[in-house]
Amino acid sequence: MAKEKFERTKPHVNIGTIGHIDHGKTTLTAAITKHAALRGFGKFVAFDEIDKAPEERERGITISTAHVEYETAKRHYAHVDCPGHADYIKNMITGAAQMDGAILVVSADDGPMPQTREHILLARQVGVPSIVVFLNKCDMVDDEELIELVEMELQELLTKYEFPGDDTPIVRGSALKALEADTSDDPAAEPILKLLDVLDEYVKEPVRDTDKDFLMPIEDVFSISGRGTVVTGRIDRGIIKTGEEVELVGIRDTTKTICTGVEMFRKLLDEGRAGDNVGLLLRGTKRDAVERGQVVAKPGTITPHTKFKAEIYCLSKEEGGRHTPFFSGYRPQFFFRTTDVTGVLSLPEGVEMIMPGDNAAITAELIAPIAMEKELRFAIREGGRTVGAGVIGEIIE
């Protein structure tokens, strides 16, 4: 049997299940793959296969994540599901699995629980653009009014964290009953098919990396006699064409220059695109005026800052993190893109310390400015060893 070729004819969207433990995230994931497969879109992945998700390491942090894929008539979805609550937190903070949208699974007989709230907050902090709700275990609740109360509570909770609560689609069903249904005509399967339609309609297609504003973190700087200064790195997003104006942002004062050449594997190109490892020739720029840790970007699209708020996860001792807690005034290095910058970290009022394995909202101030924006990921390091991971929630100055 020949291996089937991945046809990229449909738009691709990354999705994930979030929500409180035992509310049915993994059962729902299995049910979706089953009914997508019954319609000829992808293959069924059983509950047990998803539940024993392999461990992955992302920036030194161990995360268990299950990846499944399925299609609808309109789209191809890559879907992540995490077995444990801690895995979700790590996943969202490190950006190991970027989500264009999330399915919030809430059990109708429990209603919103602490992790429901925490996952919504995290989704807001790390920039998940949209959430749809699957109200699970509706077969266990006889009282229509109770279900409506849970829905109202969810709408309020979503609105509180700046999602459009009143416009958020809520699909009622039972993931287990759907998983047990063997045909798509079975009434129990209907909510799953409806959920897939809702994903198609409500979750927006992501902007492709090549359509975003150009940005490349500088990894290295060379001086080529007779040609000038070349900076190398992997283009993070956007497209750079020869002759375009760029800005050098971070660490020093922002300067403008012209990119006079794009090279890849020693060949000259007309343009470099997101994902390419390239060398950019910069007009009139001295070798010592640029350094690793700066970014080359489309002018006016990113600014340097030193002070920000972030959501961080502190590695546990088992993950190779610290053995002891840290307090306000802690001075680690913050690793942004390609470089470490020392900074001082402050904890929110009422939080005395952060223990290894905890996550927390913090404020940090760096000793040198870095090109930054909301949702930028970073690592927290001590002498080259990663002790935490974070994502910027808000820029202060």
UniProtKB/Swiss-Prot annotation:
It is found in: Cytoplasm. GO terms for cellular component: cytoplasm. Its main location: cytoplasm. GTP binds at residues 19-26, 81-85, 136-139. Residues 60-64 are annotated as: G2. CDD domains: EF_Tu (cd01884), EFTU_II (cd03697), EFTU_III (cd03707). Residues 81-84 are annotated as: G3. This is Elongation factor Tu. It comes from Desulforapulum autotrophicum (strain ATCC 43914 / DSM 3382 / VKM B-1955 / HRM2).
